[in-house]
Amino acid sequence: KPERIASRFLFYCLASPWFIERCNLLAYGAKMPRVNWPTQLAQFNLPLPPLPEQKRIATYLDTSCAAIDAAVAAKRSQLDTLDALRKSIIQRAVTYGVEANPKLRQVDSDWLREVPSHWSVCRVKRVVARMDYGIGVSTVDEGRYPVLKMGNIQEGEIRFTNLDFIDEVDDNLILETGDLLYNRTNSPDQVGKAAVFRKSRTDAITFASYLVRLRVNHRVNAWFLNYVLNSTGFLAFARRLAVPSVQQSNLNSTRYAQMFIPLPPMQEQLAILSFLNEKTAAVDSVVATIQAQIDTLTAYRKSLIHECVTGQRRVTEADVAAIA
């Protein structure tokens, strides 16, 4: 009813935190929560200032939110730039090392074109003592052994969140510090991601069947290898090898093991690892600062909408003119 409520004011009412929170409280259905229109939503009481004030509030919020959204977009662009920088630092270090102007040699492999002349190039299987698929049994919400899944591998690290459990597992499938996990089945843009397991809990942990464990041998440092496996060049080729299916791709261990990797001497691996840990930590620190700024702007946007549509903040013509 346009004679009673301005459409943009109604939009901001429906987008306000208090309205969304009430909807969440009333929602029913486990798989697809929903709210009923005639018996629930239609019964909500909305704040209804005079129509001219509604339009003034909507105009003020349109301009204010557009400015906030532009600031957030600029900061997200900064995050994209930092992500590209992080990836380029890793890609260069694992393929050329950290010395300036190394003497290079050509190599005939799938994703590598040249490496420092004193480096080796070998297949993944040559630096791995064993490869194991994870458990294929059903998990439960509570149990003895936490189970890592594909969602627990993020940005080259393992996140111990949203864990499922099982009560029994073969001892051979308990993870040890230095074990690498790669995601053999996932969406085309996520398959192949890897992480190193570092034991930081007292309980034994295992892993699900969509993950493959690589236990390295004496030729490679697991954390250096993790940088290689997550480098843009290696991942791009690995994903080309993955077999697509409906919304998923599969990269089996046989194909993965055949891929080539650069292999510097061990001391150089450790030097590259130290360099990358320092550089990526610096980038990650800036990323965290920018993300905190985005979170602050997002929270302010929600708060501003809430205060304006509930009357906690009165919007005058002078307010609208000041931001026009």
Segments from the language model and where they lie:
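Short, surface-exposed loop/turn microsegments at beta-strand edges and helix-strand junctions
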Residues: 3, 37, 137-147, 160-175, ...
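Short, solvent-exposed loop/turn positions at domain surfaces
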Residues: 29, 168-169, 245, 288-291
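Non-catalytic DNA-recognition/assembly elements of restriction-modification systems
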Residues: 51-55, 66-67, 106-135, 258, ...
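Short amphipathic coiled-coil heptad-repeat segments
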Residues: 66-117, 289-321
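Amphipathic alpha-helical coiled-coil segments
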Residues: 275-289
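A short glycine-rich beta-alpha junction/loop motif
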Residues: 5-8, 28-55, 203-211, 220, ...
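Short, ligand-facing micro-motifs at secondary-structure edges
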Residues: 8-12, 21-28, 153-165, 180-207, ...
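Sequence-specific dsDNA recognition surfaces
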Residues: 107-108, 122-137, 151-180
